[in-house]
Design a protein with these regions (language model features):
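Short beta-strand elements in bilobed, periplasmic/extracellular small-molecule ligand-binding domains
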Residues: 56-76, 137-138, 187-203
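Beta-alpha junction/loop-to-helix N-cap segments that form part of ligand/metal-binding clefts
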Residues: 65-129, 226-241, 245-250
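Extracytoplasmic "Venus flytrap"
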Residues: 25-51, 56, 65-75, 226-231, ...
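Hydrophobic alpha-helical segments within soluble ligand-binding/sensing domains
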Residues: 24, 120-165, 265-285
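An alpha-beta-alpha
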Residues: 31, 49, 139-191, 291-308
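Pocket-lining segment of extracytoplasmic ligand-binding domains
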Residues: 175-245, 251
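Short, low-complexity disordered leader/linker segments with a strong preference
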Residues: 1-29, 85, 331
Length: 331
């Protein structure tokens, strides 16, 4: 009987420790921010996060250290492990790859509030949008642009004629690209829109795939989220525009690079949202009581150079709300 009682007490103690890990009890905490690459959007999100912490009067209580891996996955892993070994109380990975790495390295030992992850469920960071896994202790903010929003916008601006299809392109090596491609394809299936899907491996391959298109067969091209091509969109954008095929992206960087249209995200607000979650956790809210929070204040972005080249006239409601940009060439 004593052995059984001891076992029960041990289990209760373990459960208490596990529960305590999701709730902050310290007056001062160390927060490690990790990002794989240096990007203007990440800078904006980081500054927004710090501003929210400062507005809460907690800049001297929530001590933040930010490190970048400069594009090297091995360095990113080392940074996260350093946060673990250094006794950090909370890790904030920026974007999907660092978030995936953080949950695998931390294994539920350190709470994680990720920032700007496209789909934490698809990426196996959370079991669903509202549930924190005890194995990962991760929640945070998402910047995903709904597939129905982008596709219906494309249909309104460049209607699908009889016999035409949508051409969906995605980077086969990027989790976010696969995720947004599948969401777009599923939405097209649900609406009965005809479409084709093709994968590419890099920017030159995307141009090769585009050159093989028949302009009379497709109403437009939809490019799934891809940080590589978003930063180097000029070649693909120019190729499709010269062919007379409108191309829609899911990041405003794509529009600045030569896509006709996308929806933009204010990453300062994403940072504010993440900062709010950090403040709430610091003040005692359990991690499991904080579902993933989704950004929803999307703004329409139109490339006026591409619009003019294609001779497209925007519907009045879109023209009234759009932010216009011109093509920016990558260095």
């Amino acid at each position: 009987m004593k052995k059984v009682l001891a076992l029960v007490l041990a289990v209760i103690m373990l459960m208490a420790v596990a529960a305590a890990e999701t709730v902050n009890t310290k007056e001062t905490i160390k927060v490690g921010v990790v990002q794989l690459v240096d990007m203007a959007d990440s800078d904006s999100a980081y500054e927004g996060m710090l501003a929210t912490i400062a507005e809460a009067g907690l800049s001297d209580k929530i001590i933040v250290e930010r490190q970048s891996a400069a594009g090297d996955a091995g360095t990113m892993t080392t940074i996260i492990q350093g946060f673990v070994d250094g006794g950090y109380d909370l890790i904030v990975p920026v974007l999907t790859p660092p978030a995936q790495a953080a949950v695998n390295i931390c294994g539920g030992e350190i709470p994680i509030i990720f920032m700007s992850v496209v789909d934490p469920v698809y990426s196996k960071i959370m079991p669903d949008w509202n549930t924190v896994s005890p194995d990962f202790l991760a929640t945070g903010t998402s910047n995903t642009i709904p597939a129905d929003l982008m596709i219906e916008t494309a249909n309104d601006i460049t209607p699908i004629a009889e016999g035409e299809k949508i051409f969906i392109m995605y980077n086969t090596s990027q989790n976010n690209a696969q995720c947004t491609m599948e969401a777009a394809a599923a939405y097209c299936d649900s609406m009965g829109y005809a479409y084709d899907v093709v994968g590419y491996t890099d920017v030159p391959d995307s141009v090769t795939q585009a050159n093989a298109l028949d302009p009379d067969e497709y109403a437009y091209v939809y490019v799934a989220l891809d940080s590589v091509i978003a930063a180097n969109f000029n070649q693909l954008g120019e190729t499709l525009t010269e062919m007379g095929i409108p191309v829609y992206g899911v990041a405003d960087a794509m529009t600045k690079g030569g896509a006709l249209c996308s929806y933009g995200v204010d990453y300062t607000i994403v940072g504010n949202m993440t900062g709010e979650m950090i403040v709430e956790w610091y003040n005692g809210t359990a991690l499991e009581d904080m579902p993933c929070r989704r950004y929803s204040e999307f703004s329409l972005v139109i490339n006026s150079d591409v619009q003019a080249a294609l001779g497209i006239e925007l519907p009045e409601d879109y023209a009234a709300q759009a932010t216009y940009v011109t093509t920016v060439r990558a260095n």
